[in-house]
């Protein structure tokens, strides 16, 4: 639309290794209702597979309802770029499923933040996340076979 080809710089290509999107909840909910949390995470992952690889017309209708400036063309373009650049489904998610997380990647980002002086090395960053609900391959069967 802008009549120019933008230059794209993915932060991940520059060594920024953190996750861009997370599902957050309270520790109390994880402890008291883990099945609820698991079902929410699983449904979110399945929803992403269906949106990116399946029929996303119903989802796009809701997006446009609450964001009237969005068009089918813009949404189609966005999905195509998400696929092209592996924004949602690439790296660890290829094997572990959308929403994949690893202790190694979280530690890598923590170490970078310590070196940059953003976080103290004594912070127990492991208390901030759990892998309990991810890395189970939920939805990978919905990805088209190549």
Model-identified regions with their sequence ranges:
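Short secondary-structure boundary/hinge segments and terminal tails
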Residues: 16-18, 81, 130-132
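Extracytoplasmic ligand-binding site segments that recognize negatively charged/polar headgroups
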Residues: 9-24
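Short, structured secondary-structure boundary patches
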Residues: 12, 28-30, 140-146
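A bilobed periplasmic-binding-protein/Venus flytrap-type ligand-binding module shared by bacterial periplasmic
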Residues: 20-35
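Ligand-binding pocket segment of bilobal, Venus flytrap-like solute-binding proteins
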Residues: 1, 26, 65
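Conserved C-terminal helix/tail region of periplasmic/extracytoplasmic solute-binding proteins
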Residues: 106-146
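Secondary-structure end/capping motifs
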Residues: 31-118
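Ligand-binding "clamshell"
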Residues: 1-11, 70-77
